[in-house]
Amino acid sequence: MVPTTESHENNMPDNAAITQQQQDATTSSSSSVATQPPQSQIPPQPQYQYQMAPPPQTHHVHPHHVHPHHQQHPGYVPSHHHHHQQHHHHHPHHVGVPNLHHSIHQQQHPGYVPSHHHHQQQHHHHQHQHQHHQHQHHQHQHHQHHQHHQHHHTSPMGAGAGAAGMPILSMSPIGAYQPPHQLTSLYVGDLAADVNEIILNELFSKVGRNAIASIHVCRDSNTLRSLGYAYVNFFNNHDAERALDTLNYTLVHGKPCRIMWSYRDPTKRKTNVGNIFVKNLEKGVDNAMLYDTFSSFGNILSCKVEFEKGISKGYGYVHFETNDSAEKAIEKVNGTLILGKPINVERFVSKVERYKVENKVFFRNADESITIEILQQELSNRFGEIESCILKNDANGKSKGLGLVEFKNQEDAQKILTESGALIISTIDGTTTVSSNGGTIEINGKPITIDRIKSKVERFTEYRKKTTDLSLFINNIDESIDRDLIKEEFAKHGTIIGIKIVQDENARNKGFGFISFSEIQEAQKALDSLNGFTFGSKQIQVSFSNKDNNQINNKLNGNSTKITKNIIQGGASASQYTGYLPINRYQQHLPHQHINPMYTQQPYFPQQQQSSSSSQPSSSQPQPSSPSHLNGNTTTTSPNTRYSKTLNGTTPFKKSNLPQNANGTNNNNNNNNTNINKSNNTTQSNGFRNKRVPNGKPRYNNNNNSSNNNNNNNTTTNVTTTPSSTETTTPKTTITLEFITNATAEEATETLGSEVYNLVLAKYNNNIELAAKIAGMIVDAVPEHKELFEIISNGQIQSKIEEAKSLLDQPDQE
């Protein structure tokens, strides 16, 4: 039999039925061959199809190619011999290469040739164009025939299956080759946790065996657990449409899967065009029922009922492809019954647009005697028709005095807000702004506070701004002092509206707290009077929790403080040894602007050996010490000595030195500060960290601050000018949740890190290196910006700082 480009169906043996069925399952169009990829795109694993061999007289095989076994089986010719005969004039170096594998195989199977023989015959008229392609194919021929012998004994194909125009059957797995055209993707959601790619392949193969290009189940990167959704890619759009129409909401492991078109462009997913909102749904309405209800009005891109813990929330969303379909659905379905309950269908309104519509008002401070019926009657008679009214009750059914009122018309809601004084309309430079501070109306002779609906971020921002302007931060509280004693003492200076002393699990105070006054003048008076006041065995430190007020009134210990910059330069950074953020990350945002230029003229390098006295500053020279009031307006800090030892002296620290005169001695010769310097110098030279007295404050007498400052100012006037009291170490910016929300991730991290850095400085005597370490630890431990903001705002940051400090003390205590 001679292989031609015509069909072999009349001469097809019985065992060819297998191959013919597989070809019918894939495609029967002759154009499929033309769409096959070039040789460079075909995977290296060959694909075979077996055909009947041609009669021996049709092949003019070179005598050198004939093996002795060929004479015994004249009906079988290896395809590569025919290949040599066709291209003998192109590849003369291939002539006469015997193949032992073909000789053995001819004795066992004298009627078959590999499929590439027929494939090359089809392209014989293109040999000048594909000469290089066929040459590469021939170079791998011996290896391919060896694989052919192994495969033929396990799954032989019938002859005649490679008729003209029929595609070559792929023996590789589905999806091994992706055509160059664009794939069509479907999103498959609401999947069970144990559903994988194999299960989805069995489901979607009902559309067509070779219709699927790939399947990907999305999983958690850490646990590799399924996230409950997957993407199925199809070769063409028709198969994807058929899968969406026939397989949507099919049960997969007991859960109906939700299929929708996958849009990589986020603008198509987030657009509100054609999106409708369906509410007042019965609990039994699921995704499939909602889809069937609206599918007759147009092509649905997505359809979903909101569930919480397996229970329907009573509302859902339907996203149509066009806006006309959505309008038609609203007109026809709104008010219809589903499971005996009328549903409400309306256009979807985004959250941003919802807050712009002022048809709802919030009320609070309502008397217990006022019920919903009284509210509805009074408000509807005075302002307009009411759509709904909600009054919150506690667990015992007692009214909380707050709730929501929804008017049918937006004008009625604006009317009650205007008459109550809740809205403040102001015009500045032609720009009109509307603000709301809450107003009051009377119902049954009793006042009720009325305000507009505000978002959570807006409410928290207003609360934060109001409380920080009137709140004081109290630090260094003795553990034996309770809340009532502090409240009693602070109440002498004004009306207290709130007090919070942070306690541990044993109900003992942690040494800090917050107290709020009704007026800013009262808070200022309490700060002036009680800052440095002795409670028990400790002197408390009082400051405004608002940084703007701290900028003006930072009177800690009766002096304004200055912190010189301490930046690690050269060598390895500190974060390489501690695992935390570098020191200068949070320093660069601190407004420590007023720094004497003489402070940064001489770098300081910690020595590796304490015995290197030649390079150490002499004991007569005051070394940088722990925070103390040396000249009334400046303090410097020393590196943590244990930290320097960890670096083994390899990393230099650029250290600011105290101002010195020509002979190398310090200009500050005040006797009260001399003892402090000597104590700190001794501690530094011995290689230990700076010591603190039990109450956590430096050794100095607070009663001598006035005289010390006068003496210091007199002795240092030739070096620097004392800055005004308004220049302090605290930043000018006030952190708000609105700023954190709108800022970029990097800006929010830097801002919150700087805030934590300042708090650690105030808590641990301006220890710059310790502050940088702890700030880095806390920022890394709480990566969520809003969570860290709440920890800072409610005072929990102090406990986090103490925990970080205890962790730093554990590894290498001396």
From Swiss-Prot:
Basic and acidic residues composition bias: which ranges? Answer: 1-11
**GO terms for CC?**
cytoplasm; cytosol; nucleus; ribonucleoprotein complex
Q: Where is this region: Disordered?
A: 1-165, 605-730
List the biased-composition ranges (Low complexity): 16-39, 606-628, 661-686, 701-730
Locations listed in the record: Cytoplasm; Nucleus
Q: Where is the PABC domain?
A: 732-813
Query: Out of the domains of life, which is the source?
Result: Eukaryota
Q: Where does the record place the RRM domain?
A: 184-264, 274-350, 359-455, 470-547
List, in alphabetical order, the GO biological process terms annotated in this UniProt record. Answer: mRNA processing
Q: Where is the composition biased (Basic residues)?
A: 59-72, 79-94, 115-154
Alphabetically sorted, this entry's keywords are: Cytoplasm, mRNA processing, Nucleus, Repeat, RNA-binding
Recorded GO molecular functions are: mRNA 3'-UTR binding; poly(A) binding; poly(U) RNA binding
Q: What is stated as this protein's family in its record?
A: Belongs to the polyadenylate-binding protein type-1 family.
Stated role: Binds the poly(A) tail of mRNA. Appears to be an important mediator of the multiple roles of the poly(A) tail in mRNA biogenesis, stability and translation.
Q: What is this protein called?
A: Polyadenylate-binding protein 1-B
The organism's taxonomy opens as: Eukaryota, Amoebozoa, Evosea, Eumycetozoa, Dictyostelia
This protein's encoding gene: pabpc1B
